[in-house]
Every structure is written in C-alpha cells, then in structure tokens.
C-alpha cells in the first residue's frame, strides 16, 4: 500500500503542479 501511495502522491504532485502553473 505504501508503494502505491507513493505512486499516487507523485501523480497528485504532478497534477497539482499543472494546476499551480
């Protein structure tokens, strides 16, 4: 689960960066 969460966090951060731009 932790590994999956890490992947999810990476994807979430990418989305946040896009929205932040």
From Swiss-Prot:
Example of a GO MF term: toxin activity
Location (main, coarse): secreted
GO cellular component: extracellular space
UniProt tissue specificity: Expressed by the venom gland.
Regulation: Inhibited by PMSF, bovine aprotinin (APR), and soybean trypsin inhibitor (STI). Is not inhibited by EDTA, beta-mercaptoethanol, and high temperature (85 degrees Celsius).
The keyword Hydrolase belongs to this UniProt entry's keyword annotation: yes
Entry's EC annotation: 3.4.21.-
GO annotation, biological process: proteolysis
Keywords of this entry: Disulfide bond, Fibrinogenolytic toxin, Hemostasis impairing toxin, Hydrolase, Protease, Secreted, Serine protease, Toxin
Family to which the UniProt record says this protein belongs: Belongs to the peptidase S1 family. Snake venom subfamily.
Protein name: Alpha-fibrinogenase A1
Source organism (scientific name): Crotalus atrox (Western diamondback rattlesnake)
